[in-house]
Amino acid sequence: MRIAGVNLPLNKHAVIALTHVYGIGKTTAKTILQRTGIAPDRKISDLNDAEAHSIRELIAEEYKVEGQARGEQQLSIKRLMDVGCYRGLRHRRSLPVRGQNTQTNARTRKGKRKTVAGKKKAARK
């Protein structure tokens, strides 16, 4: 079953399968299923066409998912960088944005280590 251009795993429960769509977490998935009247513990393979269609329609009408959600996130980060606020500067420099320490950690955000040559010792005579 495809929703918002994503193939959902057929062997998983509906709540978990919906989280494979970018922009839908567990809470949103539970809300969607509750509003469409589908039990959260039903497998995706057990859903009929009408139920799948109701899920698709609800997501299309009321939620920003996949490309739309990613684009919105990129725009908000770009806005922070254009304004020149502290968070924007941290994004621009590829450093942690939320106040984490950077002296020893933050390798994921900073990338691979850039080796800096140490001070050479003078040769003794």
Swiss-Prot record:
The keyword Cell inner membrane does not apply. One of its GO terms (biological process) is translation. Residues 107-125 have a biased composition (Basic residues). GO terms for cellular component: cytosol; small ribosomal subunit. Residues 91-125 are annotated as: Disordered. One of its GO terms (molecular function) is rRNA binding. The keyword rRNA-binding applies. This is Small ribosomal subunit protein uS13. It comes from Chlorobium phaeovibrioides (strain DSM 265 / 1930) (Prosthecochloris vibrioformis (strain DSM 265)).
